[in-house]
Swiss-Prot record:
Name listed for the protein in its UniProt record: Ribonuclease 3
Lineage summary: Bacteria, Pseudomonadati, Pseudomonadota, Gammaproteobacteria, Pseudomonadales
GO terms of molecular function: metal ion binding; ribonuclease III activity; rRNA binding
PROSITE patterns per the UniProt record, alphabetical: DS_RBD (PS50137), RNASE_3_1 (PS00517), RNASE_3_2 (PS50142)
Keyword Metal-binding in annotation: yes
EC code: 3.1.26.3
Gene3D superfamilies with a match to the protein in the record: 3.30.160.20, Ribonuclease III domain (1.10.1520.10)
Entry-linked InterPro entries: dsRBD_dom (IPR014720), RNase_III (IPR011907), RNase_III_dom (IPR000999), RNase_III_sf (IPR036389)
Reaction equation(s) it catalyzes: Endonucleolytic cleavage to 5'-phosphomonoester
Length: 229
C-alpha cells in the first residue's frame, strides 16, 4: 500500500483489507477501465438509509416532511463535497487526463460521488455496522447543527419542495383582496394545493409576505409542520 493511501485511510478513520476496493472508489469514469459508479450507487443508498435512521431516532417528534428536508441537507452534494475536501480527497482521485486538466479534482459533483463510492467500498470491505459508524462519524458536526426549524428556506420553498417530492402540481397563489390606503395596504392571498380540499389563506403588508403566510398555513394543513416548527 502506498504511503499516500495510508494517509487517506487515517483521515477516513478506516483501513481497507482490500486495497482494490479503495482504489476503485477513487476512480472516476474518465479514467481508463473500471470506475466507481456502481460503488457510488451503493454508497448513496447506504448514506440515505443511515442518515434517515439517525434522524428518525434523533427527532422522535418530527413529521415525515421534516425528516425528508433534514436528510436532504445532510446528503446533498454540497455537504458531501465539503466533507471530501476535509479529507483532501481530490488529491487521491484517479481521473482521465482531460478531467484532470479541467480541474475535476476540485469539482463538487466528483468529490461527492467519490465519497459515496467510499461508503459503498467500506460496506463491501467490512459490513453495514462499520459503514454506519463511519458515516455517522463523518456527519457528526452536520448533525449537531440540525434543528427542526429550517431557517434557510422560506415557507413557499418548503411547500414547493414537499409537493415536488410527491410529483404534485406546484401551488397556485392568487391575490383575492387588497385593503387600505396606498401607503398602508394589506394584501389577502389564497394558496391552492392539489392535496388540500380547501385553499389556504394569508395576509400581509405585501403580496410576497401574504403568499409566505398562505404557504405556511398550507404546510400545517398538510400535516408537514405543526405551527411550532
Amino acid at each position: 500500500m502506498t504511503a499516500s493511501l495510508a494517509r487517506l485511510e487515517r483521515k477516513l478513520g478506516y483501513t481497507f483489507k482490500n486495497q482494490d476496493q479503495m482504489l476503485l472508489a477513487l476512480t472516476h469514469r474518465s479514467y481508463a477501465g473500471r470506475n466507481n459508479e456502481r460503488l457510488e450507487f451503493l454508497g448513496d443508498a447506504i448514506l440515505n438509509f443511515v442518515a434517515g435512521e439517525a434522524l428518525f431516532e434523533r427527532f422522535p417528534q418530527a413529521r415525515e416532511g421534516q425528516l425528508s428536508r433534514l436528510r436532504a441537507r445532510l446528503v446533498k452534494g454540497e455537504t458531501l463535497a465539503r466533507l471530501a475536501r476535509g479529507f483532501d480527497l481530490g488529491e487521491y482521485l484517479r481521473l482521465g487526463s482531460g478531467e484532470l486538466k479541467s480541474g475535476g479534482f476540485r469539482r463538487e459533483s466528483i468529490l461527492a460521488d467519490a465519497l459515496e463510492a467510499l461508503i459503498g467500498a467500506i460496506y463491501l470491505d467490512a459490513d453495514m455496522d462499520t459503514a454506519r459508524e463511519r458515516v455517522l462519524a463523518w456527519l457528526a458536526d452536520e448533525f449537531e447543527g440540525l434543528t427542526l426549524v429550517d431557517t434557510n428556506k422560506d415557507p413557499k420553498t418548503r411547500l414547493q419542495e414537499f409537493l415536488q417530492s410527491r410529483s404534485c402540481e406546484l401551488p397556485r397563489y392568487e391575490v383575492v383582496d387588497i385593503q387600505g390606503e396606498p401607503h398602508c395596504r394589506t394584501f389577502f392571498v389564497e394558496c391552492e394545493v392539489v392535496l388540500l380540499n380547501n385553499k389556504s389563506r394569508g395576509q400581509g403588508v405585501s403580496r410576497r409576505i401574504a403568499e409566505q403566510v398562505a404557504a405556511a398555513s398550507a404546510l400545517i394543513a398538510l400535516g408537514v409542520e405543526n405551527g411550532n416548527d
